């Protein structure tokens, strides 16, 4: 095909897309749609702040209006293990409008975490620590550490060191009275 100058009134035409080119374009469009849908479904599937070992998922906003106690522990922390029966006792008779969760200081897989909770007879809901876990507090500098989150979602108290069921109940009563 001979090109003519624009001044002669002719334009250069590009050859039509071949069938192979059309198929490639169609394939890319379909691939982009699938990728976009997969991203949307993945995003919607991970719309929670934390998950417990028993598979329950939670958003902090859904816990608004409740008092939430979060206890950081580790199997290598003797005081943490000593306070676990106290936390279990507290969990058995939670004050009104109160939730209790424990979270292992070191990230573990679900099977590792399950084995650990069975080995140490941990009888409170345990949060699975993962990169996706969102808590209103940062990891504490030492253990055990217990955080009390108020109904507004803000940390109301941090207790560093061992706690007892009586101490937790007393502290919650004080905080609820001040609120």
Located regions from the model:
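Conserved hydrophobic/aromatic "anchor" residues
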Residues: 48, 72-73, 116, 124, ...
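A short beta-strand-turn-helix
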Residues: 48-68, 135
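Thiol/disulfide oxidoreductase modules built on the thioredoxin-like
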Residues: 118-122, 128-173
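Short pre-active-site segment immediately N-terminal to redox-active cysteine/selenocysteine motifs
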Residues: 66-68, 72-76, 142
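Conserved segment of the thioredoxin-like fold in thiol-based oxidoreductases
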Residues: 82, 92-130
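N-terminal targeting signals for export/organelle localization
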Residues: 1-51, 179
């Amino acid at each position: 095909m001979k090109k003519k100058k624009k001044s002669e009134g002719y334009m250069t035409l590009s050859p039509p897309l071949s069938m192979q080119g059309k198929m490639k374009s169609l394939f890319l469009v379909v691939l982009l749609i699938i990728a976009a849908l997969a991203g949307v479904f993945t995003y919607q599937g991970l719309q929670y702040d934390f998950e417990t070992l028993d598979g329950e998922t939670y958003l902090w906003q859904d816990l608004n209006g409740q008092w939430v106690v979060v206890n950081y522990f580790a199997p290598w922390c003797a005081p943490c293990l000593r306070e676990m029966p106290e936390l279990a006792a507290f969990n058995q008779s939670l004050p009104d409008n109160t939730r209790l969760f424990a979270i292992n200081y070191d990230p573990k897989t679900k099977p590792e975490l399950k084995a650990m909770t069975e080995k140490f007879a941990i009888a409170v809901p345990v949060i699975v620590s993962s990169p996706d876990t969102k808590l209103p507090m940062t990891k504490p500098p030492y253990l055990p550490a217990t955080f009390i989150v108020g109904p507004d979602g803000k940390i109301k108290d941090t207790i560093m060191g061992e706690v007892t069921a009586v101490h937790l109940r007393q502290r919650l009563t004080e905080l609820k009275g001040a609120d």
